[in-house]
């Protein structure tokens, strides 16, 4: 499992009071997407951040909306999406574009983007990572924890 060695998430240890975090979540593969979103919201609620959720059609739309949220004042974004490999190059195009775009949004704004974009070979891999009752991992929660932790680190570095 890809999560081997991942740190334990203790959302109660995060104090994100005063932070504004936008969750940008794709709509494809609803059961997996809903699990990712629930995990992210659980961590953000426990951290005490002000949260806005924006649903986008798919993963390709994540970067432009993430960038807009950061430009509009969000301290961080949690990007959630699901891309499952099929029989055409579409998987590679969308995965690469979304990943590159999210990286650019973060670097150009100087604000964190928690990366909760699952790129999968099959649906079961997504179910295993979606934070559902039978899941082994919770990538939505991990992405939210990364976004809040990094936003707090950047505030400390910048003396804000």
Swiss-Prot record:
UniProt pathway annotation: Cofactor biosynthesis; riboflavin biosynthesis; riboflavin from 2-hydroxy-3-oxobutyl phosphate and 5-amino-6-(D-ribitylamino)uracil: step 1/2
UniProt-listed Enzyme Commission number(s): 2.5.1.78
Protein's gene: ribH
Task performed by this protein: Catalyzes the formation of 6,7-dimethyl-8-ribityllumazine by condensation of 5-amino-6-(D-ribitylamino)uracil with 3,4-dihydroxy-2-butanone 4-phosphate. This is the penultimate step in the biosynthesis of riboflavin.
Gene Ontology terms for molecular function: 6,7-dimethyl-8-ribityllumazine synthase activity
Catalysed reaction equations from the record: (2S)-2-hydroxy-3-oxobutyl phosphate + 5-amino-6-(D-ribitylamino)uracil = 6,7-dimethyl-8-(1-D-ribityl)lumazine + phosphate + 2 H2O + H(+)
Superkingdom in the source lineage: Bacteria
Name under which the protein is recorded: 6,7-dimethyl-8-ribityllumazine synthase
Organism: Clavibacter sepedonicus
GO terms for cellular component: cytosol; riboflavin synthase complex
UniProt keyword Glycoprotein, yes or no: no
InterPro entries for the chain: LS, LS/RS, LS/RS_sf
């Amino acid at each position: 499992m890809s999560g081997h060695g991942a740190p334990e998430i203790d959302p109660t240890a995060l104090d994100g009071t005063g932070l504004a975090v936008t969750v940008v979540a794709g709509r494809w593969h609803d059961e997996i997407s809903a699990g990712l979103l629930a995990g992210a919201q659980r961590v953000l609620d426990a951290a005490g951040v002000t949260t806005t959720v924006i649903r986008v059609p798919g993963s390709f739309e994540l970067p432009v909306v993430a960038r807009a949220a950061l430009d509009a004042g969000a301290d961080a974004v949690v990007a959630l999406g699901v891309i499952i490999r099929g029989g055409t190059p579409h998987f590679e195009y969308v995965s690469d574009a979304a990943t590159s775009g999210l990286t650019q949004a973060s670097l150009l704004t100087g604000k964190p983007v928690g990366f909760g974009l699952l790129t999968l070979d099959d649906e079961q891999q997504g179910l295993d990572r979606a934070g559902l009752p039978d899941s082994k991992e919770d990538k939505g929660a991990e992405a939210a924890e990364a976004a809040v932790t990094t936003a707090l680190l950047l505030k400390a570095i910048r003396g804000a």
